[in-house]
Each structure stands twice: as C-alpha cells, then as structure tokens.
Design a protein with these regions (language model features):
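Active-site regions of metal-assisted phosphoester/phosphodiester hydrolases
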Residues: 1-37, 51, 61-62, 67-71, ...
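A short, gly/pro- and small-residue-rich
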Residues: 57-59
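Active-site neighborhood of divalent metal-dependent phosphoester/pyrophosphate hydrolases
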Residues: 41-49
C-alpha cells in the first residue's frame, strides 16, 4: 500500500522572508500535497486570529486530518508555547512525548504516535490494518547534540519495543546541516532513507538538508522530495518534505 507523509517545520506560520504570519499559506501547501500523515514542527498553542482555539485544531480541520496530537516543547508564554504535532487520516491508538533535551541546551523532544493503517492482504483477500509507528522530531543546533538526541531516542522504550519488521517512520526537522545523521546514526540502527538528501533550508533558496525522513521495518521510501510550490518558498523558513512510502503487509 502506498501512503503519503509530509514533514514540515512551519516556523509558527511566519514567512521566512516577509516575516508575515499567515496560517492560510501553510494550509494551502499541505492541502495541495494531500498527505495521509502530516508531521509538523513549531506549531504554536493558539492562532493569532482565534486566540481561544488551539492551532493544531484549526490546522487539522482545514487539512481534513481529524486525528491529531500536539505537545509544546518550548513555553515562551502559556499562550505562545510551540511544539510538534502529528495529523493522521487514521486513528491514533496511543501517543507520548519523549524528552530529548541534552543538559542545559534548549528543550527538545520527539512526539510519538501509533496508528493503524489500512492495507490489502493478498493472503486474506481482504483489507486489514497494521501498526505504523511515527516519531516527529525537532533536534538541536549542534552536531554532537543532534547525535546524542537521536541515540537517546533509539534507546527509548517506544522504539525498543517495536519488532524489527514493524514499520517505523522517524522524520522532522533534524537540523542535519551536513546530511550526515543517516550515515552516522540512523543507518547503523537499521533505518533507511534516501541517498541524496533533499535541501529544504532556507526555503527561498535551499542549500541545506535540515529536514529528513527515515524508515525501518516493512516499509520503504519510494520518493522523498521538497515541495516545489512557489508559495512554499514564502510561507516558512523551511520547505516541506513530501514522502511516498510503500507499506508492507504483516
């Protein structure tokens, strides 16, 4: 079964060049790509125009992904805290926020969720569901910090308990300036990505592969590309990454 996953640091819906808050641009981009799962970073608590409504709910309703979870990493203030969010076409069975903060560094975390995705079983001759484990990350700014954070994640029970054949997706803003985390950390842990890392930062003229996606188990990456929409170069300081994945059977 083919599924589409989008990962996107939305920069609190503030344009990377014009510095203008515009949630509508973010929604337009996501709706264009029609993902089954969206992993967003830097989602704020409240939208400016709807101060009593959680931004995760506004976005979720606008992109038609009704199953969602959001946890703030950074609390600038109670109203303006921001963090990671997962949106899914299919029900979220469980979720947990995993602290990846290293010492006195800025607070960082991975948001974990498990969904039951539908697949067609040739053996059974009918549609079934299977578990898909999602990890949405926003890693630190130093190379040592990022490697330590990924290793901390890989040792967490939410990863360790998952059987080797069960599909896992690890994606997000990895701040992977040199595109080396796959070779240094994820590959040795049994995860696969793409050989040529798509450049996503800065959005208006990308030169760095800060964002990425890795999989393990009965799932493979068929395509991983940055959005080529003109509006995506304005809406945030990152481009979204869009992945087409092939999900295998149990």
């Amino acid at each position: 079964m083919k599924i589409k996953v989008l990962t996107y640091n939305i920069h609190k819906c503030v344009g990377g060049v014009d510095r203008r808050y515009d949630l509508g641009r973010i929604v337009e981009i996501i709706n264009h790509h029609q993902p089954d799962i969206a992993l967003l970073q830097e989602v704020v608590r409240h939208s400016k125009s709807l101060s009593d409504t959680l931004q995760v709910d506004v976005i979720g309703e606008a992109i038609g992904l009704s199953h969602r979870v959001w946890v703030p990493n950074v609390r600038v203030s109670e109203a303006r805290g921001y963090g990671n969010a997962i949106f899914s076409r299919w029900p979220l069975i469980e979720s947990v926020n995993i602290d990846l903060t290293i010492g006195p560094k800025k607070k960082r975390s991975a948001l974990y969720a498990r969904v039951r995705a539908p697949i067609f079983s040739q053996r059974a001759g009918q549609s079934q569901t299977r578990s898909l484990h999602l990890f949405n990350l926003h890693l630190g700014l130093s190379g040592i910090e990022r490697r330590m954070q990924l290793k901390k994640l890989l040792l967490h029970a939410s990863v360790q308990r998952v059987a080797k054949n069960t599909p896992i997706i690890v994606a997000g803003d990895l701040n992977d300036v040199w595109g080396s985390l796959g070779r240094q950390v994820m590959g040795p842990a049994g995860f696969h990505g793409v050989r040529r890392k798509p450049k996503t930062f800065p959005a208006y003229a990308p030169v760095r592969p800060l964002d990425s996606l890795y999989v393990r188990g009965k799932i493979r990456v068929e395509n991983l590309l940055p959005s080529r929409l003109a509006i995506a170069r304005q809406a945030s300081d990152h481009l979204p990454l869009v992945a087409e994945l092939i999900l295998g059977q149990e």
